[in-house]
Amino acid sequence: MGKKPLNENQVKSLRKLVSGKPLHELLLNLSVDLMLRGSDLLNLKVSDVISENGKVKSEVMVKQKKTKKSTLRIPLSDHSIKTIQKHLMDKSRDDFIFKGQKSYTGKPISVIQYTRIVKQWMEMLGVDPIDYSSHSMRKTKPTVIYEKTKNIDAVRRLLGHSSVTATSSYIGVTDNSALDLARTYSF
């Protein structure tokens, strides 16, 4: 299954813990909402989330670099919209959203730095960071959606996966969880 996803309570706790830290607020909310690989997330620009007329977009269109598949259309939550309004409205549309402390370079933080931040968040939560990385953030929302709905095809589409098999493996649908589901619907 790889790195663990966060659960809803961990995300809610982190929102409080990172409040007031622009990079962390943006990274937390957008990484959970957009469900993107680190490289795709970090390459987002302000123009991806704010329209030409200066309004925050309700959906983000992203073409995943790894798969080069069709463009994904992903909705933004109220948390992300408010965070964008709070931290990005005065930025140039050409700016990367996730600029690091060396912002004079104009480049976004690296995936390595993103992983360090995620591990730092886990430490803030009192959780062993060994099982978490930037990829944990990509897995968080799809795992919660699957746990609540059991709709693996919807999750597959949100992640841009080509097969349900890949998605099942990715979010850790095990034989035991499938059997538990079958037991739930005995009649």
Question: Language-model segments: what does each one mean?
Answer:
Residues 1-187:
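Conserved catalytic core of the tyrosine transesterase superfamily
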